[in-house]
């Protein structure tokens, strides 16, 4: 009987051979963030050069890529005027209002501290879900 491949028992070689989407294997967690930031940065640069907007739908996790991306953007003086971030979600309180930005679980607060406050990205290009709308 053939052993069923599961997350717990799949080897790197099996995963790479059977994956239905492109996969890159990196050595460390820091490498993941560097890779994600590099992919995002290159997309921004490529679209800027072509005169196109860049649109990302971004989660709050994983989290390490945002500061790395900010470093790349700032080092290269990259224009973010045509870059749009659609933030995926936000926690609500018991009254269905977004939790305050200073709350440790606030996506808005996290993204402000780890990305928006570090770069020159227009406020109107930052989108968050609004409860009830």
Residue ranges and their predicted role:
Residues 1-56, 74:
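N-terminal glycine-/serine-/threonine-rich phosphate-binding loop
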Residues 5-20, 31, 79-133:
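Ligand-binding beta-strand-loop-alpha-helix segment within the catalytic cores
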Residues 32, 64-65:
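Short phosphate-engaging motifs
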Residues 35, 39, 68, 110, ...:
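Alpha-helical scaffold segments in soluble metabolic enzymes
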Residues 58-63:
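Glycine-rich beta-strand-to-loop/alpha-helix junction loops that act as flexible
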Residues 66-77:
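Histidine-anchored nucleotide/phosphate-binding helix
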């Amino acid at each position: 009987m053939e052993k069923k491949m599961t997350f717990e028992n799949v080897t790197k070689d099996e995963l790479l051979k059977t994956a239905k989407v492109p996969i890159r294997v990196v050595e460390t967690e820091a490498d993941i963030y560097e890779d994600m930031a590099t992919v995002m940065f290159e997309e921004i640069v490529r679209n800027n050069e072509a005169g196109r907007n860049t649109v990302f739908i971004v989660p709050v996790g994983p989290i390490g890529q945002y500061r790395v991306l900010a470093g790349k953007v700032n080092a290269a003086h990259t224009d973010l005027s045509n870059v749009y971030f659609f933030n995926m979600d936000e926690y609500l309180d018991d009254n269905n209002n977004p939790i305050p930005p200073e709350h440790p679980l606030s996506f808005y607060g996290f993204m402000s501290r780890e990305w928006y406050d570090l770069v020159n990205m227009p406020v109107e290009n930052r989108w968050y879900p609004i409860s009830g709308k």
